[in-house]
Amino acid sequence: MGLRALLRLALGFPAPPRRPPLVQCALAGTGPRRLIAYLTPGSQGWILDFLWRDLTATSVWGDGEAPELLVASDRNSLASMMEGADAFVLVMFQGHLPRLLRDGIPAERVILYMSHVRIGLGLPDLSRLHGVLALNAHEEALLRMQGVESERLHRFPAGYDPRLFFPGRPLAQRRFDVLFVGRYVGSSNSNYHQRKRYPLLCDLIGLLSHQGLRVAVLGNGWQACEYPLPAALELIDAPHSDYGAVYRQTRLVCSVSAQEGGPVSFLEGLVSGCLMLSVATGFAADFQSGVDGIWHLPLKAEAPLWCEQIQACLLAAQADPDLGSGVCSPARQAFLEAAQFERLALQLRQLCDQSLIGGSMERSDG
Protein backbone atom coordinates (compact mmCIF):
# COMPACT_ATOMS: atom_id res chain seq x y z
CA MET A 1 0.00 0.00 0.00
CA GLY A 2 1.37 3.41 -0.91
CA LEU A 3 2.13 6.29 1.45
CA ARG A 4 -0.94 8.25 0.35
CA ALA A 5 -3.23 5.28 1.00
CA LEU A 6 -1.67 4.76 4.46
CA LEU A 7 -2.15 8.43 5.28
CA ARG A 8 -5.81 8.25 4.26
CA LEU A 9 -6.34 5.28 6.60
CA ALA A 10 -4.53 7.05 9.45
CA LEU A 11 -6.85 10.04 9.05
CA GLY A 12 -9.91 7.82 9.09
CA PHE A 13 -10.72 7.98 5.38
CA PRO A 14 -11.57 4.80 3.48
CA ALA A 15 -8.78 3.25 1.47
CA PRO A 16 -8.87 4.06 -2.25
CA PRO A 17 -10.07 1.25 -4.50
CA ARG A 18 -7.40 -1.08 -5.78
CA ARG A 19 -6.22 -0.41 -9.29
CA PRO A 20 -6.78 -3.23 -11.75
CA PRO A 21 -3.69 -5.28 -12.64
CA LEU A 22 -1.77 -4.57 -15.82
CA VAL A 23 -3.40 -6.21 -18.82
CA GLN A 24 -1.09 -8.92 -20.17
CA CYS A 25 -0.98 -8.94 -23.96
CA ALA A 26 0.63 -11.74 -25.94
CA LEU A 27 3.98 -11.31 -27.60
CA ALA A 28 3.78 -10.30 -31.24
CA GLY A 29 2.83 -13.28 -33.38
CA THR A 30 1.79 -15.51 -30.46
CA GLY A 31 -1.82 -14.48 -29.97
CA PRO A 32 -4.81 -13.29 -31.99
CA ARG A 33 -4.17 -9.94 -33.67
CA ARG A 34 -6.67 -7.25 -32.76
CA LEU A 35 -7.21 -3.54 -33.25
CA ILE A 36 -9.76 -2.24 -30.76
CA ALA A 37 -11.40 1.18 -30.88
CA TYR A 38 -12.17 2.59 -27.44
CA LEU A 39 -15.49 4.38 -27.95
CA THR A 40 -17.64 5.08 -24.90
CA PRO A 41 -21.44 5.41 -25.23
CA GLY A 42 -21.03 9.20 -25.32
CA SER A 43 -19.22 8.89 -28.66
CA GLN A 44 -22.14 7.23 -30.43
CA GLY A 45 -23.58 9.39 -33.19
CA TRP A 46 -20.61 11.78 -33.16
CA ILE A 47 -17.65 12.20 -35.46
CA LEU A 48 -15.36 9.68 -33.72
CA ASP A 49 -17.97 6.96 -34.12
CA PHE A 50 -18.36 7.80 -37.82
CA LEU A 51 -14.60 7.97 -38.31
CA TRP A 52 -14.07 4.43 -37.00
CA ARG A 53 -16.92 3.12 -39.15
CA ASP A 54 -15.48 4.69 -42.30
CA LEU A 55 -11.90 3.58 -41.61
CA THR A 56 -12.92 -0.02 -41.00
CA ALA A 57 -15.16 -0.17 -44.08
CA THR A 58 -12.18 0.10 -46.44
CA SER A 59 -10.57 -2.80 -48.30
CA VAL A 60 -7.37 -2.47 -46.25
CA TRP A 61 -8.65 -4.92 -43.64
CA GLY A 62 -9.85 -7.62 -46.03
CA ASP A 63 -6.88 -10.01 -46.12
CA GLY A 64 -6.27 -12.92 -43.78
CA GLU A 65 -3.31 -11.23 -42.07
CA ALA A 66 -5.30 -8.18 -40.97
CA PRO A 67 -6.08 -7.73 -37.28
CA GLU A 68 -9.59 -8.39 -36.03
CA LEU A 69 -11.46 -5.09 -35.64
CA LEU A 70 -13.37 -4.63 -32.39
CA VAL A 71 -15.00 -1.87 -30.33
CA ALA A 72 -14.82 -1.58 -26.53
CA SER A 73 -17.11 0.78 -24.63
CA ASP A 74 -15.55 0.50 -21.15
CA ARG A 75 -12.33 -0.49 -19.44
CA ASN A 76 -13.39 -4.02 -18.53
CA SER A 77 -14.51 -4.97 -22.03
CA LEU A 78 -11.31 -3.45 -23.42
CA ALA A 79 -9.15 -5.42 -20.99
CA SER A 80 -10.89 -8.70 -21.82
CA MET A 81 -10.33 -8.14 -25.55
CA MET A 82 -6.64 -7.31 -25.04
CA GLU A 83 -5.77 -10.00 -22.49
CA GLY A 84 -3.68 -12.72 -24.15
CA ALA A 85 -3.96 -11.08 -27.58
CA ASP A 86 -1.47 -9.29 -29.81
CA ALA A 87 -3.67 -6.22 -29.56
CA PHE A 88 -3.55 -2.47 -29.99
CA VAL A 89 -6.20 -0.04 -28.77
CA LEU A 90 -7.06 3.11 -30.69
CA VAL A 91 -8.05 5.64 -28.02
CA MET A 92 -10.34 8.03 -29.87
CA PHE A 93 -10.51 10.78 -27.20
CA GLN A 94 -7.46 11.92 -25.26
CA GLY A 95 -9.53 12.54 -22.13
CA HIS A 96 -9.87 8.78 -21.68
CA LEU A 97 -6.15 8.09 -21.84
CA PRO A 98 -4.96 8.86 -18.26
CA ARG A 99 -7.65 6.69 -16.68
CA LEU A 100 -7.03 3.78 -19.04
CA LEU A 101 -3.31 3.81 -18.27
CA ARG A 102 -3.99 4.00 -14.53
CA ASP A 103 -6.36 1.06 -14.91
CA GLY A 104 -3.78 -1.27 -16.38
CA ILE A 105 -3.94 -0.76 -20.15
CA PRO A 106 -0.31 -1.07 -21.39
CA ALA A 107 0.90 2.26 -22.76
CA GLU A 108 2.98 0.58 -25.47
CA ARG A 109 -0.23 -0.95 -26.84
CA VAL A 110 -2.02 2.42 -27.21
CA ILE A 111 -2.47 4.45 -30.39
CA LEU A 112 -3.87 7.88 -29.49
CA TYR A 113 -6.05 9.82 -31.91
CA MET A 114 -5.31 13.45 -30.96
CA SER A 115 -8.09 15.62 -32.37
CA HIS A 116 -7.11 18.98 -30.87
CA VAL A 117 -5.65 20.48 -27.70
CA ARG A 118 -8.11 20.91 -24.84
CA ILE A 119 -7.27 23.42 -22.10
CA GLY A 120 -7.16 21.87 -18.64
CA LEU A 121 -6.99 18.30 -19.91
CA GLY A 122 -3.82 16.74 -18.56
CA LEU A 123 -2.01 14.05 -20.51
CA PRO A 124 0.53 11.44 -19.45
CA ASP A 125 3.92 10.96 -21.13
CA LEU A 126 2.91 10.37 -24.75
CA SER A 127 6.37 9.04 -25.62
CA ARG A 128 5.35 5.78 -23.91
CA LEU A 129 2.61 5.13 -26.48
CA HIS A 130 2.93 3.03 -29.64
CA GLY A 131 1.69 5.90 -31.78
CA VAL A 132 0.07 9.33 -31.72
CA LEU A 133 -2.10 10.49 -34.63
CA ALA A 134 -2.20 14.26 -35.24
CA LEU A 135 -4.88 15.76 -37.49
CA ASN A 136 -2.99 18.80 -38.72
CA ALA A 137 0.41 20.48 -38.84
CA HIS A 138 -0.26 22.70 -35.82
CA GLU A 139 -1.17 19.79 -33.55
CA GLU A 140 1.82 17.86 -34.88
CA ALA A 141 4.14 20.75 -34.01
CA LEU A 142 2.71 21.00 -30.48
CA LEU A 143 3.25 17.28 -29.96
CA ARG A 144 6.84 17.54 -31.16
CA MET A 145 7.42 20.37 -28.67
CA GLN A 146 5.98 18.09 -26.00
CA GLY A 147 8.73 15.59 -26.82
CA VAL A 148 6.86 12.97 -28.84
CA GLU A 149 9.45 11.25 -31.03
CA SER A 150 9.05 11.29 -34.79
CA GLU A 151 8.74 7.48 -35.02
CA ARG A 152 5.64 7.63 -32.82
CA LEU A 153 4.04 10.71 -34.39
CA HIS A 154 1.92 10.43 -37.53
CA ARG A 155 -0.11 12.99 -39.51
CA PHE A 156 -3.64 11.65 -39.80
CA PRO A 157 -5.90 14.20 -41.57
CA ALA A 158 -9.13 12.22 -41.22
CA GLY A 159 -10.98 11.90 -43.51
CA TYR A 160 -13.39 11.68 -46.48
CA ASP A 161 -14.73 9.19 -48.99
CA PRO A 162 -13.98 10.21 -52.62
CA ARG A 163 -16.95 8.16 -53.81
CA LEU A 164 -19.25 10.60 -51.98
CA PHE A 165 -17.27 13.84 -52.22
CA PHE A 166 -15.87 15.09 -55.53
CA PRO A 167 -15.87 18.28 -57.65
CA GLY A 168 -19.11 19.68 -59.01
CA ARG A 169 -20.27 22.16 -61.60
CA PRO A 170 -18.84 25.70 -61.92
CA LEU A 171 -19.56 27.91 -58.91
CA ALA A 172 -21.76 30.30 -60.86
CA GLN A 173 -24.22 27.45 -61.52
CA ARG A 174 -24.55 26.42 -57.87
CA ARG A 175 -27.66 26.93 -55.78
CA PHE A 176 -26.28 28.21 -52.44
CA ASP A 177 -23.94 31.13 -51.99
CA VAL A 178 -22.88 30.19 -48.46
CA LEU A 179 -23.10 26.93 -46.50
CA PHE A 180 -22.48 26.34 -42.80
CA VAL A 181 -22.01 22.72 -41.72
CA GLY A 182 -22.59 21.17 -38.31
CA ARG A 183 -25.23 20.23 -35.80
CA TYR A 184 -26.64 22.73 -33.33
CA VAL A 185 -25.74 22.04 -29.70
CA GLY A 186 -27.41 24.15 -27.02
CA SER A 187 -25.74 26.43 -24.49
CA SER A 188 -26.09 23.78 -21.77
CA ASN A 189 -23.00 22.18 -23.39
CA SER A 190 -20.88 25.24 -22.64
CA ASN A 191 -17.52 24.05 -24.00
CA TYR A 192 -18.84 22.93 -27.38
CA HIS A 193 -21.20 25.91 -27.66
CA GLN A 194 -18.41 28.40 -26.97
CA ARG A 195 -16.00 26.67 -29.36
CA LYS A 196 -18.47 26.70 -32.25
CA ARG A 197 -19.48 30.34 -31.50
CA TYR A 198 -23.16 29.96 -32.32
CA PRO A 199 -24.11 33.58 -31.42
CA LEU A 200 -21.59 34.92 -33.96
CA LEU A 201 -22.69 32.33 -36.51
CA CYS A 202 -26.36 33.28 -36.21
CA ASP A 203 -25.57 37.00 -36.41
CA LEU A 204 -23.57 36.34 -39.58
CA ILE A 205 -26.38 34.31 -41.13
CA GLY A 206 -28.73 37.24 -40.54
CA LEU A 207 -26.35 39.72 -42.20
CA LEU A 208 -25.77 37.48 -45.21
CA SER A 209 -29.48 36.93 -45.69
CA HIS A 210 -30.09 40.68 -45.44
CA GLN A 211 -27.56 41.14 -48.27
CA GLY A 212 -29.64 38.83 -50.44
CA LEU A 213 -27.25 35.88 -50.37
CA ARG A 214 -28.64 32.35 -50.48
CA VAL A 215 -27.61 30.72 -47.20
CA ALA A 216 -28.05 27.16 -45.93
CA VAL A 217 -27.11 25.22 -42.80
CA LEU A 218 -26.38 21.51 -43.13
CA GLY A 219 -26.85 19.55 -39.91
CA ASN A 220 -29.42 18.57 -37.33
CA GLY A 221 -30.74 20.23 -34.18
CA TRP A 222 -31.24 23.70 -35.65
CA GLN A 223 -34.97 23.72 -34.94
CA ALA A 224 -33.94 24.17 -31.28
CA CYS A 225 -31.61 27.12 -31.98
CA GLU A 226 -31.62 29.68 -29.14
CA TYR A 227 -30.85 32.63 -31.43
CA PRO A 228 -32.95 34.32 -34.13
CA LEU A 229 -32.54 33.02 -37.66
CA PRO A 230 -33.89 34.60 -40.87
CA ALA A 231 -36.90 33.00 -42.50
CA ALA A 232 -35.00 32.73 -45.79
CA LEU A 233 -32.37 30.41 -44.27
CA GLU A 234 -32.59 26.86 -45.60
CA LEU A 235 -32.10 24.18 -42.94
CA ILE A 236 -30.94 20.85 -44.36
CA ASP A 237 -31.05 17.77 -42.14
CA ALA A 238 -29.78 14.94 -44.32
CA PRO A 239 -27.82 11.71 -43.84
CA HIS A 240 -24.09 12.09 -44.27
CA SER A 241 -24.21 10.06 -47.49
CA ASP A 242 -26.15 12.99 -49.03
CA TYR A 243 -23.78 15.73 -47.87
CA GLY A 244 -21.69 15.62 -51.05
CA ALA A 245 -24.67 16.61 -53.19
CA VAL A 246 -25.21 19.68 -50.98
CA TYR A 247 -21.56 20.75 -51.21
CA ARG A 248 -21.69 20.45 -54.99
CA GLN A 249 -24.56 22.96 -54.93
CA THR A 250 -22.53 25.42 -52.81
CA ARG A 251 -20.17 28.24 -53.76
CA LEU A 252 -18.55 28.93 -50.37
CA VAL A 253 -18.31 26.92 -47.13
CA CYS A 254 -17.80 29.01 -43.99
CA SER A 255 -16.85 28.10 -40.42
CA VAL A 256 -16.56 30.62 -37.57
CA SER A 257 -15.46 27.98 -35.04
CA ALA A 258 -12.75 29.20 -32.66
CA GLN A 259 -10.88 25.90 -32.63
CA GLU A 260 -10.91 22.78 -34.79
CA GLY A 261 -8.80 19.71 -35.25
CA GLY A 262 -10.26 19.32 -38.75
CA PRO A 263 -13.06 19.85 -39.35
CA VAL A 264 -14.21 17.13 -41.73
CA SER A 265 -16.40 19.72 -43.46
CA PHE A 266 -13.21 21.49 -44.58
CA LEU A 267 -12.07 18.38 -46.45
CA GLU A 268 -15.52 17.76 -47.88
CA GLY A 269 -15.94 21.34 -49.07
CA LEU A 270 -12.41 21.49 -50.41
CA VAL A 271 -12.75 18.39 -52.59
CA SER A 272 -16.15 19.60 -53.81
CA GLY A 273 -14.51 22.69 -55.31
CA CYS A 274 -16.06 25.16 -52.83
CA LEU A 275 -14.42 28.36 -51.69
CA MET A 276 -13.41 28.09 -48.01
CA LEU A 277 -13.46 30.73 -45.26
CA SER A 278 -12.66 30.14 -41.59
CA VAL A 279 -10.45 31.08 -38.68
CA ALA A 280 -6.88 29.82 -39.15
CA THR A 281 -7.47 26.65 -37.17
CA GLY A 282 -7.34 22.94 -37.95
CA PHE A 283 -6.81 21.97 -41.58
CA ALA A 284 -7.29 25.56 -42.78
CA ALA A 285 -4.08 26.65 -41.04
CA ASP A 286 -2.12 24.32 -43.35
CA PHE A 287 -2.95 26.72 -46.22
CA GLN A 288 -1.92 30.30 -46.96
CA SER A 289 -4.84 32.71 -46.71
CA GLY A 290 -5.97 34.23 -49.99
CA VAL A 291 -4.43 31.49 -52.12
CA ASP A 292 -6.19 28.66 -53.94
CA GLY A 293 -9.68 29.69 -52.85
CA ILE A 294 -9.00 29.50 -49.11
CA TRP A 295 -9.24 32.49 -46.77
CA HIS A 296 -8.77 33.06 -43.02
CA LEU A 297 -10.07 35.77 -40.72
CA PRO A 298 -8.72 36.73 -37.28
CA LEU A 299 -10.33 35.12 -34.27
CA LYS A 300 -11.56 38.53 -33.07
CA ALA A 301 -13.34 39.36 -36.34
CA GLU A 302 -17.01 40.20 -35.81
CA ALA A 303 -20.00 39.37 -37.99
CA PRO A 304 -19.83 42.47 -40.28
CA LEU A 305 -16.22 41.68 -41.24
CA TRP A 306 -17.13 38.04 -41.93
CA CYS A 307 -20.00 39.20 -44.13
CA GLU A 308 -17.73 41.62 -46.00
CA GLN A 309 -15.07 38.94 -46.55
CA ILE A 310 -17.60 36.40 -47.83
CA GLN A 311 -18.82 38.87 -50.44
CA ALA A 312 -15.21 39.60 -51.45
CA CYS A 313 -14.50 35.86 -51.83
CA LEU A 314 -17.54 35.37 -54.05
CA LEU A 315 -16.52 38.31 -56.23
CA ALA A 316 -12.97 36.95 -56.49
CA ALA A 317 -14.31 33.66 -57.84
CA GLN A 318 -16.36 35.50 -60.46
CA ALA A 319 -13.21 37.26 -61.68
CA ASP A 320 -10.94 34.18 -61.62
CA PRO A 321 -11.88 31.32 -64.00
CA ASP A 322 -9.75 28.83 -62.05
CA LEU A 323 -11.45 29.60 -58.74
CA GLY A 324 -14.86 29.60 -60.34
CA SER A 325 -14.42 26.31 -62.17
CA GLY A 326 -15.53 24.10 -59.28
CA VAL A 327 -12.55 21.80 -59.93
CA CYS A 328 -9.82 21.02 -57.39
CA SER A 329 -6.47 22.67 -58.06
CA PRO A 330 -3.24 20.61 -57.87
CA ALA A 331 -2.43 22.09 -54.43
CA ARG A 332 -5.81 21.09 -53.04
CA GLN A 333 -5.60 17.66 -54.63
CA ALA A 334 -2.20 16.93 -53.10
CA PHE A 335 -3.52 17.75 -49.63
CA LEU A 336 -6.69 15.73 -50.15
CA GLU A 337 -5.03 12.54 -51.38
CA ALA A 338 -3.58 11.90 -47.93
CA ALA A 339 -6.98 12.44 -46.30
CA GLN A 340 -8.93 9.71 -48.10
CA PHE A 341 -10.20 6.96 -45.82
CA GLU A 342 -8.44 4.26 -47.84
CA ARG A 343 -5.07 5.99 -47.38
CA LEU A 344 -5.69 6.62 -43.68
CA ALA A 345 -6.77 3.03 -43.07
CA LEU A 346 -3.58 1.81 -44.76
CA GLN A 347 -1.57 4.10 -42.51
CA LEU A 348 -3.32 2.69 -39.44
CA ARG A 349 -2.82 -0.88 -40.67
CA GLN A 350 0.90 -0.26 -41.14
CA LEU A 351 1.10 1.15 -37.63
CA CYS A 352 -0.52 -2.03 -36.27
CA ASP A 353 1.96 -4.13 -38.27
CA GLN A 354 4.96 -2.36 -36.77
CA SER A 355 6.91 -3.98 -33.98
CA LEU A 356 6.52 -2.43 -30.56
CA ILE A 357 8.77 0.60 -30.14
CA GLY A 358 10.99 0.26 -27.08
CA GLY A 359 10.42 -2.17 -24.25
CA SER A 360 7.15 -3.87 -23.35
CA MET A 361 5.62 -5.62 -20.37
CA GLU A 362 3.88 -8.45 -22.18
CA ARG A 363 3.86 -12.00 -21.00
CA SER A 364 5.52 -14.91 -22.72
CA ASP A 365 3.58 -18.15 -22.60
CA GLY A 366 6.86 -20.03 -22.87
Where are these regions (language model features)?
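Conserved catalytic-core segment of nucleotide-activated headgroup transferases in glycan assembly
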Residues: 177-226
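Nucleotide-activated donor-binding/catalytic signature segment of Leloir-type glycosyltransferases, i.e.
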Residues: 221-241
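Acidic anion/phosphate-binding donor-loop and adjacent secondary structure
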Residues: 121-123, 159-175
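Short hydrophobic beta-strand element within catalytic cores of glycosyltransferases
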Residues: 275-278
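N-terminal pre-catalytic "stem/leader" segment of glycosyltransferase-like enzymes
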Residues: 1-92
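A charged, aromatic-enriched C-terminal amphipathic alpha-helix characteristic of glycosyltransferases
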Residues: 301, 305, 321-353
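Extended catalytic core of nucleotide-activated donor transferases of GT-like folds
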Residues: 56-142, 147
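Aromatic "clamp/platform" in nucleotide-sugar-dependent glycosyltransferases that forms part
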Residues: 258
